[in-house]
Amino acid sequence: MNQPTSSKNKILTWQALGLMTFSSVWGFGNIVNGYANQGLKAVVSWIIMFTIYFIPYTLMVGEMGSTFKDSQGGVSSWIRSTSSAKLAYFAGWTYWICHMPYLAQKPQSMLVALGWAIFRNGSLTKMMSPLVLQSIALILFFFFLWYASRGIRSLKHIGALAGSTKVIMSFLYILLALAAPYITEAKTFTYRLDMETLMPTFDFDYMTTLAILVFAVGGCERLSPYVNNLKDPSREYPRSMIFMTIMVCVTAILGTFAMGLMFDPQNVPKVPHDEWFLLLLCKTWRILRRRSN
């Protein structure tokens, strides 16, 4: 587990690892879920969550990664070094089991996104029989499994691409919400940045929705096995965690403000979570069509 990595495999930069971690931790759906549950009050919730949980959590992961910079097993290696091999085994096993549903739904999510890109609706998966759909999802899963087995160079390229794309798309949405009234005839909502608008009510219902934000910012330790692929792990791994943390904080807060421009903060639509993306895509598409016309 703790075998030194040869110099030829130390090809990751801290920026690339930060983008890879960002793509595994963050998604725009987290902003949508936060706004759907709390409206603009999610801004304060994000700040609370980042202050008491996410920032300390990422700093601890960065410290562990720099301390055990020669390990190749990530969390399992850390537990093995500080406790026992048996506990490390159980940690690795439970980590894999809890990620099985997450990994299994990823290929199907790609097909849903492809359907929106081609047909501008979510009908692609409904056009297929369950057997065909699951067969395609399985082929996609094995393809990316094969691609990942090619080594760190392949992961570096696809991880950096995924992270960069998420960052760019998040900021494009924020810019679109701000620029929509100026480039089209689309109207956006206005709101006051005061305590009444931003401060949530700290009751039981609020605490239950706060749990959604906790799960939204977990998983920065997933890329810890690649810490020894950095040229200077003790310095660069914490730097990559700080880089990722800043990007998450900025996109979460600015993205929530942008949602408030497109959806009335005083009358947040009460629709199921799986329909929020439909609302978001339809509204964005209408703005873009007005621009093209």
In which residue ranges do the predicted regions lie?
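Membrane-interface "cap" regions at the ends of multi-pass membrane proteins
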Residues: 1-44, 48, 54-62, 70
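TM-loop-TM module centered on a large, flexible mid-protein loop between adjacent transmembrane helices
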Residues: 76-80, 84, 116, 120-121, ...
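Hydrophobic, membrane-embedded alpha-helices of multi-pass small-molecule transporters
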Residues: 12-29, 49, 137-140, 177-180, ...
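Membrane-interface helix termini and inter-helical loops of multi-pass transporters
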Residues: 33, 114-126, 183-196, 268-270
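Juxtamembrane helix-boundary/capping and inter-helix hinge elements in multi-pass membrane proteins
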Residues: 38-41, 68-73, 81-87, 228-236, ...
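Membrane-interface loop-to-helix entry segments
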Residues: 114, 132-186, 218, 240-249
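Hydrophobic alpha-helical transmembrane segments in multi-pass membrane proteins
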Residues: 54, 103-107, 166-174, 244-256, ...
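Hydrophobic transmembrane alpha-helices that form the core helical bundles
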Residues: 55-67, 71-141, 146-149, 174, ...
